[in-house]
Protein backbone atom coordinates (compact mmCIF):
# COMPACT_ATOMS: atom_id res chain seq x y z
CA UNK A 1 0.00 0.00 0.00
CA UNK A 2 1.32 3.43 -0.90
CA UNK A 3 2.11 5.88 1.86
CA UNK A 4 -0.26 8.81 1.63
CA UNK A 5 -2.54 10.89 3.83
CA UNK A 6 -5.33 8.36 3.35
CA UNK A 7 -3.19 5.43 4.55
CA UNK A 8 -1.71 7.21 7.56
CA UNK A 9 -2.11 5.41 10.86
CA UNK A 10 -4.01 8.36 12.27
CA UNK A 11 -5.02 11.86 11.15
CA UNK A 12 -2.03 13.13 13.16
CA UNK A 13 0.27 11.40 10.66
CA UNK A 14 -1.98 12.38 7.78
CA UNK A 15 -3.88 15.61 7.30
CA UNK A 16 -2.69 17.18 10.57
CA UNK A 17 0.96 16.27 10.06
CA UNK A 18 2.10 19.85 9.50
CA UNK A 19 0.19 21.07 12.56
CA UNK A 20 1.81 18.60 14.95
CA UNK A 21 5.29 18.49 13.40
CA UNK A 22 6.89 20.32 16.38
CA UNK A 23 5.65 17.51 18.66
CA UNK A 24 7.49 14.83 16.67
CA UNK A 25 10.68 15.66 18.59
CA UNK A 26 8.87 14.70 21.82
CA UNK A 27 6.41 11.94 20.86
CA UNK A 28 8.02 9.92 18.06
CA UNK A 29 9.41 6.46 18.64
CA UNK A 30 12.87 8.01 18.37
CA UNK A 31 11.95 10.38 21.20
CA UNK A 32 10.70 7.54 23.38
CA UNK A 33 13.94 5.63 22.86
CA UNK A 34 15.97 8.77 23.60
CA UNK A 35 14.07 9.35 26.84
CA UNK A 36 14.54 5.69 27.81
CA UNK A 37 18.30 6.14 27.36
CA UNK A 38 18.12 9.30 29.48
CA UNK A 39 16.28 7.49 32.28
CA UNK A 40 18.61 4.46 32.23
CA UNK A 41 21.67 6.73 32.33
CA UNK A 42 20.24 8.80 35.18
CA UNK A 43 19.51 5.60 37.12
CA UNK A 44 23.03 4.24 36.59
CA UNK A 45 24.52 7.55 37.75
CA UNK A 46 22.25 7.54 40.80
CA UNK A 47 23.39 4.01 41.66
CA UNK A 48 27.02 5.10 41.45
CA UNK A 49 26.26 7.85 43.99
CA UNK A 50 24.64 5.39 46.39
CA UNK A 51 27.22 4.46 49.07
CA UNK A 52 25.20 1.39 50.04
CA UNK A 53 25.95 -0.27 46.70
CA UNK A 54 29.63 -1.13 47.01
CA UNK A 55 29.68 -2.96 43.66
CA UNK A 56 29.36 0.36 41.84
CA UNK A 57 31.95 2.90 42.92
CA UNK A 58 31.31 6.59 42.44
CA UNK A 59 31.94 7.38 38.77
CA UNK A 60 34.70 9.83 37.90
CA UNK A 61 33.83 13.22 36.45
CA UNK A 62 35.01 11.98 33.03
CA UNK A 63 32.68 9.00 33.16
CA UNK A 64 29.75 11.17 34.23
CA UNK A 65 30.49 13.49 31.29
CA UNK A 66 30.60 10.49 28.94
CA UNK A 67 27.20 9.35 30.20
CA UNK A 68 25.75 12.86 29.87
CA UNK A 69 27.10 13.18 26.33
CA UNK A 70 25.51 9.87 25.40
CA UNK A 71 22.16 11.44 26.24
CA UNK A 72 22.76 14.91 24.79
CA UNK A 73 24.27 13.59 21.54
CA UNK A 74 21.80 10.73 21.06
CA UNK A 75 21.21 10.42 17.32
CA UNK A 76 18.83 8.78 14.88
CA UNK A 77 21.56 6.25 14.08
CA UNK A 78 21.75 5.41 17.80
CA UNK A 79 18.00 4.88 17.80
CA UNK A 80 18.27 2.69 14.71
CA UNK A 81 20.98 0.61 16.41
CA UNK A 82 18.63 0.07 19.35
CA UNK A 83 15.84 -0.94 16.95
CA UNK A 84 18.17 -3.55 15.39
CA UNK A 85 18.82 -5.01 18.85
CA UNK A 86 15.09 -4.95 19.53
CA UNK A 87 14.50 -6.98 16.36
CA UNK A 88 16.55 -9.74 18.01
CA UNK A 89 15.34 -9.41 21.61
CA UNK A 90 11.70 -8.54 20.84
CA UNK A 91 11.89 -6.27 23.88
CA UNK A 92 12.18 -2.51 23.50
CA UNK A 93 13.53 -1.61 26.94
CA UNK A 94 15.93 -4.58 27.03
CA UNK A 95 17.29 -3.36 23.69
CA UNK A 96 18.15 -0.01 25.29
CA UNK A 97 19.93 -1.83 28.12
CA UNK A 98 21.96 -3.96 25.69
CA UNK A 99 22.83 -0.93 23.55
CA UNK A 100 24.09 0.95 26.60
CA UNK A 101 26.26 -2.00 27.61
CA UNK A 102 27.71 -2.27 24.09
CA UNK A 103 28.21 1.46 23.63
CA UNK A 104 29.86 1.97 27.01
CA UNK A 105 31.95 -1.23 27.05
CA UNK A 106 35.13 0.75 26.33
CA UNK A 107 34.79 2.68 29.60
CA UNK A 108 36.48 0.69 32.38
CA UNK A 109 34.35 2.14 35.18
CA UNK A 110 31.10 1.46 33.39
CA UNK A 111 32.22 -1.94 32.12
CA UNK A 112 32.66 -3.00 35.76
CA UNK A 113 29.15 -1.76 36.55
CA UNK A 114 27.51 -2.90 33.29
CA UNK A 115 25.32 -5.50 34.96
CA UNK A 116 23.84 -2.73 37.09
CA UNK A 117 22.37 -0.97 34.06
CA UNK A 118 18.61 -1.43 34.61
CA UNK A 119 19.32 -2.93 38.07
CA UNK A 120 16.15 -3.30 40.20
CA UNK A 121 14.03 -1.71 37.46
CA UNK A 122 11.08 -3.01 35.54
CA UNK A 123 10.33 -1.90 32.01
CA UNK A 124 7.42 0.07 33.43
CA UNK A 125 9.81 1.98 35.72
CA UNK A 126 11.72 3.13 32.65
CA UNK A 127 8.67 3.69 30.45
CA UNK A 128 6.57 5.71 32.87
CA UNK A 129 9.47 8.06 33.60
CA UNK A 130 10.18 8.35 29.87
CA UNK A 131 6.56 9.19 29.12
CA UNK A 132 6.57 11.75 31.91
CA UNK A 133 9.67 13.38 30.43
CA UNK A 134 8.02 13.40 27.00
CA UNK A 135 5.02 15.27 28.39
CA UNK A 136 7.13 17.66 30.47
CA UNK A 137 9.43 18.54 27.58
CA UNK A 138 6.62 18.99 25.08
CA UNK A 139 4.75 21.22 27.51
CA UNK A 140 7.82 23.38 28.16
CA UNK A 141 9.01 23.66 24.57
CA UNK A 142 5.88 23.49 22.41
CA UNK A 143 2.52 23.64 24.15
CA UNK A 144 3.03 26.36 26.76
CA UNK A 145 4.81 28.70 24.30
CA UNK A 146 1.91 28.18 21.86
CA UNK A 147 -0.59 28.95 24.62
CA UNK A 148 1.39 32.08 25.53
CA UNK A 149 1.06 33.25 21.91
CA UNK A 150 -2.69 32.58 21.95
CA UNK A 151 -3.11 34.47 25.23
CA UNK A 152 -1.08 37.40 23.91
CA UNK A 153 -3.22 37.54 20.77
CA UNK A 154 -6.46 37.36 22.80
CA UNK A 155 -5.29 40.19 25.06
CA UNK A 156 -4.38 42.22 21.99
CA UNK A 157 -7.80 41.58 20.41
CA UNK A 158 -9.62 42.34 23.67
CA UNK A 159 -7.97 45.77 23.86
CA UNK A 160 -8.42 46.41 20.15
CA UNK A 161 -12.12 45.47 20.16
CA UNK A 162 -13.11 46.63 23.65
CA UNK A 163 -15.37 49.40 22.31
CA UNK A 164 -17.02 47.36 19.56
CA UNK A 165 -20.63 46.53 20.45
CA UNK A 166 -21.63 42.88 20.04
CA UNK A 167 -24.98 41.20 20.02
CA UNK A 168 -25.27 38.87 23.00
CA UNK A 169 -25.56 35.21 22.08
CA UNK A 170 -26.59 32.06 23.87
CA UNK A 171 -25.75 28.76 22.24
CA UNK A 172 -24.94 30.64 19.04
CA UNK A 173 -28.39 32.28 18.88
CA UNK A 174 -29.10 36.04 19.27
Segments predicted by a language model, with ranges:
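A helix-coil-helix interface module used to build multimeric assemblies
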Residues: 1-174
Amino acid sequence: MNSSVITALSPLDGRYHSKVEPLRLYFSEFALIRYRVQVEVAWLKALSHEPGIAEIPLFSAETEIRLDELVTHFSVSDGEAIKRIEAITNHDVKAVEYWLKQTLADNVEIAKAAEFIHFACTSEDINNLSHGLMLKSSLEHVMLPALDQIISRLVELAHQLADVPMLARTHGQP
